[in-house]
Amino acid sequence: MNQERVFKVLLGPHVSEKATVLAEKKGQFVFKVATDATKLEIKKAVEGLFNVKVENVSTVNVLGKTKRTARGLGKRNDWKKAIVSLQPGQDLDFSSSAE
């Protein structure tokens, strides 16, 4: 997979209360990914970008919420979430990948 596709697959970390608990207790990290990304692409992107070994990737398609505005109903975009499990002994540090 080329370097350009790696940056298009991983859109960024998803920070939430549940994601923080998963990272601390189970060593699982949550990313916002492209809607057309496959599990294999996500695995290769995380391994290549952060130099870690990935054990498992689970994906969830999150439906956008319907919101009311002054002009009627609107809808937020659908997006895809990936929960990445690392092999035992591996840890992910977001600050070191920016080098």
Curated annotation (Swiss-Prot):
Organism: Pseudomonas putida (strain ATCC 47054 / DSM 6125 / CFBP 8728 / NCIMB 11950 / KT2440)
NCBIfam families in the record: PRK05738.1-3 (NF004359), PRK05738.2-4 (NF004363)
UniProt-listed Pfam families: Ribosomal_L23 (PF00276)
MF terms in GO: rRNA binding; structural constituent of ribosome
InterPro entries: Nucleotide-bd_a/b_plait_sf, Ribosomal_uL23-like, Ribosomal_uL23/eL15/eS24_sf
Family: Belongs to the universal ribosomal protein uL23 family.
Quaternary data: Part of the 50S ribosomal subunit. Contacts protein L29, and trigger factor when it is bound to the ribosome.
Role, per record: One of the early assembly proteins it binds 23S rRNA. One of the proteins that surrounds the polypeptide exit tunnel on the outside of the ribosome. Forms the main docking site for trigger factor binding to the ribosome.
GO cellular component terms listed in the entry, alphabetical order: ribonucleoprotein complex; ribosome
Full protein name: Large ribosomal subunit protein uL23
SUPFAM superfamilies referenced in this protein's UniProt entry, alphabetically: Ribosomal proteins S24e, L23 and L15e
GO terms classed as biological process: translation
Keywords: Ribonucleoprotein, Ribosomal protein, RNA-binding, rRNA-binding
Keyword rRNA-binding carried by entry: yes
